[in-house]
A protein has these predicted regions:
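Catalytic core of membrane glycerolipid acyltransferases/transacylases, capturing the structured
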Residues: 32-33, 47-104, 112
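Residues at the C-termini of beta-strands that transition into short coil/loop
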Residues: 43, 80, 101, 159, ...
Length: 227
């Protein structure tokens, strides 16, 4: 598969003006000031080349926060219902998200994800496919591993800490709890598209993310700057 390293600089994935505007005028103040956001492990994020970013999902806050904190633009596969939510829908679309129908085989979304990976983009996928009240990865789906197997892109586990407490399922108003984004070590793509290989890689992603969630808080461990 082509890597962004093989493209002239002008053709490599770049954030759009609207992406930059929303990130720094809206998402940054909310994450950094209101939620006292902190980051760990940003040096583990490959700066170029195709990448499948996998994360836990506990809140509607997750897509913009993940897109803001990682040091490269990320396009998201998000459930189609989110695009009908006032304010949130236009926001996540401006941040590079594209819709996928949950519970159905959405070939167009898969083609979009593969196309972006072929151009060297990072594509973000929430491993469960839907929010979990616990904030952990509880019921991981095989889609991320399949994308990785088809594209040859590595998987990057990312833990979003406390977003389920800040604005979880059923909550109308946010709670201003401290948020943290933790990045793990990249995981190689599955050796094949066979179901046992996809399941093994998916399980490795689940274990890596949940281990990051259980790690000591940033108050006792060194923290890297967000970007």
């Amino acid at each position: 598969m082509p890597s962004s390293q093989n493209f002239p600089l002008i053709l490599r994935p770049q954030p759009s003006p609207s992406y930059r505007l929303v990130q720094w005028l809206l998402v940054a103040p909310i994450f950094r000031l209101l939620f006292r956001g902190r980051c760990r492990g940003m040096e583990r994020v490959p700066r170029q080349g195709p990448l499948v970013v996998v994360a836990n999902h506990g809140s509607h806050l997750d897509p913009p926060l993940l897109g803001h904190t990682l040091p490269r633009p990320v396009s998201f596969m998000a459930k189609a219902e989110l695009f009908t939510v006032p304010v949130l829908g236009p926001l996540i679309r401006s941040l590079g998200a594209y819709p996928v129908s949950r519970g159905a085989s959405d070939r167009e979304a898969i083609r979009t994800a593969l196309g972006r990976l072929e151009l060297g983009w990072a594509t973000g996928i929430f491993l469960d496919g839907t929010r979990q009240a616990s904030g952990r990865v509880e019921d991981p789906q095989l889609g991320a591993a399949l994308l990785s197997a088809r594209s040859g892109a590595a998987l990057l586990p990312v833990a979003l800490v406390n977003t389920h407490r800040a604005l979880g399922p059923g909550q109308t108003w946010p709670r201003l709890v401290p948020l943290e984004v933790r990045v793990g070590l990249p995981i190689p793509p599955p050796p094949s598209r066979r179901r046992p290989d996809l399941e093994a890689t998916t399980r490795a992603c689940q274990e890596a993310i949940n281990a990051l969630l259980e790690a000591p808080s940033a108050s006792t461990v060194g923290v890297n700057p967000c970007r």
